[in-house]
Amino acid sequence: SYFGNFKPNNKQKREIYLLFPEPILLNRSVRANFLFTLKTYGIKEDIEERIKESLMFLNLDESLLSKHPNELSSGQSQKIAFAIALSVRAKYYLLDEPSAFLDKNTTLLFKKAILKMHENFNTGFLIASHDKHFLDSLAQKKLYLHSGEILEFENTNVFELENQGVKFCNFIDFSNCKKYKDF
């Protein structure tokens, strides 16, 4: 399991959104993908507002809502998958290589969206990435891992996460996080 020995209940699972590097979209309209995800997370209010806002964060036109995944470019698919994730307004996001395969403009849009989500909804992000430049402009705290071991811990203080890292470590029971009381 993604959570190790910790067994989160359904409410706790809905507080986390995991976004993979390859977009995962159902073979239905973009709007239907949004609606399916929001329903899965138990979200029943402000649906249209959430969809419009997440599209706006990534400079996506609402005309894409009627398209199917096979009608989208790979870049559009990646943006749509991220927009769907943002529409959930999860408490925590696990982003696996979010800048992989992105051009510079889209990478900048993703950075701005992450910062906006944190600013507007106090959302925490745990980002796994080999893209140091992407992380340098976003991360308050960085852990460098090799073969599952923490090699280095760095506090960059780009923006204040109000101890979201500590809450997240406790939430998923990372035993290594205990080494870093200030994380």
Tell where the protein language model's regions lie, with residue ranges.
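Conserved signature/switch motifs of ABC ATPase nucleotide-binding domains
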Residues: V88-A90
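Conserved catalytic motifs of ABC-family nucleotide-binding domains
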Residues: E22-A32
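H-loop/switch region of ABC-family ATPase nucleotide-binding domains
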Residues: A128-H130
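Walker B catalytic motif
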Residues: H68, E97-P98
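Conserved ABC ATPase signature
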Residues: H68-L72, Q76
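Hydrophobic anchor residue at the start of the ABC signature
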Residues: F82-I84
